[in-house]
Amino acid sequence: MLRRAARAKALQALFAIDVGGTSPDMALEQVLEEGELPPRAMTFTRELVEGTMAKRDAIDAIIRKYAVGWRLERLAAVDRNILRMALYEMQYHRETPVRVVINEAIELAKNFNNEEAGRFVNGLLDNARKDLGLSEEIENGYSGD
């Protein structure tokens, strides 16, 4: 559950960066200053935000490929950032099984948007997973979610 809370905080920071033009450092400071997360979860939040921002161009290219009929800019900002974060975690931060990352992204979409957003996120991430050749599991130790 700590990683779920960390992902929600990371999403809030990514949303502030994307929509509000907030700097990544300021966005992280704002979401982490509430002190609701233990240090390990704060570290995970920071890794997700910094990693997603570092790989954003490559991740956005993946989203564009699979968001058939949608321009990236036309996607709901919350969905766009859920997809960015999940694709970062699936492709570059391979500590969690892909199926868990996808399920967490679906839950975030349903909680921060609606059921339809959850289905959209699920479809896009699953298509990307298959096409990118990502196994649903991970080869090395799973740190737990």
Swiss-Prot record:
Protein name per UniProt: Transcription antitermination protein NusB
GO BP term, example: transcription antitermination
GO molecular function: RNA binding
InterPro entries per UniProt: NusB-like_sf, NusB_fam, NusB_RsmB_TIM44
NCBIfam families: nusB
Alphabetized UniProt keyword annotations: RNA-binding, Transcription, Transcription antitermination, Transcription regulation
Gene Ontology CC: cytosol
Keyword Transcription on entry: yes
Family: Belongs to the NusB family.
Organism listed in the record: Moorella thermoacetica (strain ATCC 39073 / JCM 9320)
Domain of life: Bacteria
Function: Involved in transcription antitermination. Required for transcription of ribosomal RNA (rRNA) genes. Binds specifically to the boxA antiterminator sequence of the ribosomal RNA (rrn) operons.
